[in-house]
Structures are given as structure tokens and as C-alpha cells.
Amino acid sequence: MTTQGRAILADRYVNKGTAFSADERRRLGLDGLLPPVVEDLDTQLRRVEVEYSSKQTDLGRHVFLRALQDRNSVLFYAFLEQHLAELLPIVYTPTVGLACQQWSRIYRRERGLFLSWPQRDRVEELLDNAVGDLDVDVVVVTDGERVLGLGDLGIGGMGIPVGKLALYTAGGGLDPSRTLPVMLDVGTDNDALLSDPLYLGWRHQRVRGAEYDELVDAFVDALGKRFPDVMLQWEDFAQLHANRLLARHRDRICSFNDDIQGTAAVSVAAIVAGLGTAGTPVGDLRLVVVGAGSAGTGIASQAVRAMVAAGDSEHDAERRCWLVDRDGLLHDRMQ
């Protein structure tokens, strides 16, 4: 390792804090930068638990964990894995929704890649700035327009890719240094954010149409050029863009949309398992989906494919699926 001193402590992926041994401190120029006591991971975890327990609100706990993740990745994931069931609702839903709403007010330190529309001609440069000499295997990208059930949160939507990737490391073992959260900041139509003096995103109404595609295309091209084997996850895009972007880019880069495909895969797997337990053929399925957004339409489409795979015609399978939203049953004669 050629990095020395404060640069090591600033690198979240190599910083061990008080766990650096006496020999490591001498060799790496850390003497004088840390308290003299050398601690093992268990002792560090006890200190984290004491401080975490002192937080009075879920948002306060979320902010504390994010700060820990930003300074010491090993310690953060050790604590997360040790208390996974307790911490999942803090790191991700439901608390991450509040954190996204307050994102510009609780911002502490850089993480991931921010691409705003005015920077669309510098995408490759900004990607290089964000990743440095690291390799990236998994990217989660959002434009913040449909964050959970909270709507348009602009740049605050960055909390979702960060949280998702933390779960993938804790639950799936991904190397956190090989993951990248990305925010495509094309503006926001949320007037409260645009008028907030602390808002950190591009202060502009959302760019749409060909201009929107210009930034997304530049991002996908740059990402595929730098990391040809990367897996890209589209996250929390409005239905207007979700299916279209997936179709537009799925043959250009390995990608999927969790709201459309991930939710559908889990839901239809549960339906098929339930039908099997009940002894009911998949071809006898009658399905009503409440909610006709990206997830609802994705579930219906996946269910149709399951019925076709079981021997039904696509026409018959589609006739046994209904979608209901706030206006009632959807049909082709609606205005």
C-alpha cells in the first residue's frame, strides 16, 4: 500500500480506525493520528452499539449508520450483519424514505456518482472521477422521480441506490468497493424542493423527451465502455420512463428494473408456489392487481408469461388478468 497517513483514514474501504496495529501505524504514517489504544473488531462493535443505542429517532439512527459507512466500511457491515433484522428497517425501508425527503439537510459526505443534465457532455470524465482506479460490478441508478411511494424527491432519491447496494453487500456478499450508486439529476418538478435554499440538486423543472434520453444514453454508453461486464439496475423511475428505458438499453448493457422485474419475479414465484400447495394448475389462475404502476404492470406481465409457459395462449392468459387503480378497473375504453 503506497497511501499514507490521513489519506488512509479518509478511504472508507481501507480505514480500520483504532484497529490498526502498532506496526501498521508506524509503517503507514498513522502514529499521532489515532488514540494510542489498539482495539479489535469486537471492541469497536461494542462502541458502535453504545452510540447507536443513544440515538432517539429512526432518522438519527439512519444518519449515524450512514456516517459509519462513510468512514469505515468494514465496521459498518460487521455491525449491520450482526444486527441485520433490527437494522434493515433503518438502513432501508421505511426509514430510507424519510432520509430521502431530508437528504439535502442530512448530507454529510460524497458517495457515488452525480450526473446532472448540464454536465451531459462530460459523463465519461465524471464517471472516472467517481470510480478512480476501482473496478465496478454492480450499479444502481435512479433519477429520483418516483421514490418509493413518496413521488418526486429529486436528488434526494440518491438514498435509494445507496441503501439498496448496502443490502446487497450485507445480504449477498458483494464487495462494497465494486458497487456504485448513481443519480441522474435531470431536475425536479417538486416545487417545495425547488424553493428550498438547502436543496442540493439542479434547480430546474425536469428535463424530458429527447433531452432526457441524451443524458441517459451518454451515461449508459460511458458505463458500458468503462465496465463492459457491469450489471446495471434501474431503480425508482416513473412509469413514463421505466419500461421504455429498460427496452431501450437492455441489449446494450446487462440491466434490469427491480420495480418491474424484481417485484414481479418474487410475486409470481409466491403465486405459483401457493397454487402448487393448493393443487391448483397455473393455467387456472385468475389475477387482480391493485395498482397499475411499474410494479403492478410488471407482475401482470410476468403472470401472463407463467400461464403461457404452463400451456395457455397469450390471449387467454391476458383475459384472466385485471388491473385496478384509483379510477377503478382499467380497460381500453377509458379516457
What are these regions (language model features)?
Residues M1-S255:
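N-terminal ligand-binding/catalytic initiation module
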Residues R252, I260-Q335:
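Glycine-rich phosphate/diphosphate-binding loop of Rossmann-like nucleotide-binding domains
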